[in-house]
From Swiss-Prot:
UniProt-listed GO biological process terms: photosynthesis; photosystem II stabilization
Annotated organism of origin: Nymphaea alba (White water-lily)
GO cellular component, one term: photosystem II reaction center
Protein name: Photosystem II reaction center protein Z
Role description: May control the interaction of photosystem II (PSII) cores with the light-harvesting antenna, regulates electron flow through the 2 photosystem reaction centers. PSII is a light-driven water plastoquinone oxidoreductase, using light energy to abstract electrons from H(2)O, generating a proton gradient subsequently used for ATP formation.
Protein encoded by which gene: psbZ
SUPFAM superfamilies in alphabetical order: PsbZ-like
Amino acid sequence: MTIAFQLAVFALIATSSILLISVPVVFASPDGWSSKKNVVFSGTSLWIGLVFLVGILNSLIY
């Protein structure tokens, strides 16, 4: 269970880092938002799911 928790935390950190870089780039590009809207929403949904997963796994471990 600890390995799953550590992998979930790593995935959350990696997703956060990717979104931290990619979202401003999408908003700064001329046609970025209209063409990359689904990618941003998918990344945000993944991030929210990982936050809940880390919370659930944390409550099971500690």
